[in-house]
Amino acid sequence: MHLSTALFSAIALLAATQVIGASVEVPRDVAAIQIATSPYYACNCPNNCKHKKGSGCKYHSGPSDKSKVISGKCEWQGGQLNCIAT
């Protein structure tokens, strides 16, 4: 009896979790997560390893995700690839 009650409770909890998770929408600011935190990381690893000279890039101008986004192109500067604003 206790086993069937525990099993039923576990299934009900799993079903409720799926329903709650399905109703959550992704916020529109998810794209902001993909923007680099500095001109260096906008053109280099870990997330932008395939960038090369002339590739388009974006980075936040300040320490916050709410900072202005600067767009540019990857260029060699001081021996390293950096995102230069265009």
Swiss-Prot record:
Residues 1-21 form the signal peptide. It is found in: Secreted. Keywords: Antimicrobial, Disulfide bond, Secreted, Signal. NFAP2 provides a feasible base for the development of a fundamental new, safely applicable mono- or polytherapeutic topical agent for the treatment of superficial candidiasis. Moreover, thanks to the slow emergence of NFAP2-resistant Candida strains, NFAP2 can reliably be used long-term in the clinic. The combination of NFAP2 and rationally designed antifungal peptide derivatives (PDs) as biofungicide can also be used for the fungal infection control in plants and crops as well as in postharvest fruit protection. A motif (Gamma-core) lies at residues 72-83. Disulfide bonds join C43-C57, C45-C74, C49-C83. It comes from the Eukaryota. Residues 44-54 are annotated as: Lipid-binding. The lipid-binding region (residues 44 to 54) shows potency to insert into the lipid bilayer, where the disulfide bond-stabilized short motif CPNNC could play a key role. In addition, several areas, including the beginning of the N-terminal (residues 1-8), play roles in facilitating initial membrane contacts. Cysteine-rich antifungal protein highly effective against yeasts such as clinically relevant Candida species, including the multidrug-resistant pathogen Candida auris. Does not cause metabolic inactivity and apoptosis induction, but the fungal cell-killing activity is connected to its pore-forming ability in the cell membrane. NFAP2 has a low potential to trigger resistance in C.albicans in vitro, and the developed tolerance to NFAP2 is not associated with severe phenotypic changes compared with development of resistance to generic fluconazole. This is Antifungal protein 2. It comes from Neosartorya fischeri (strain ATCC 1020 / DSM 3700 / CBS 544.65 / FGSC A1164 / JCM 1740 / NRRL 181 / WB 181) (Aspergillus fischerianus).
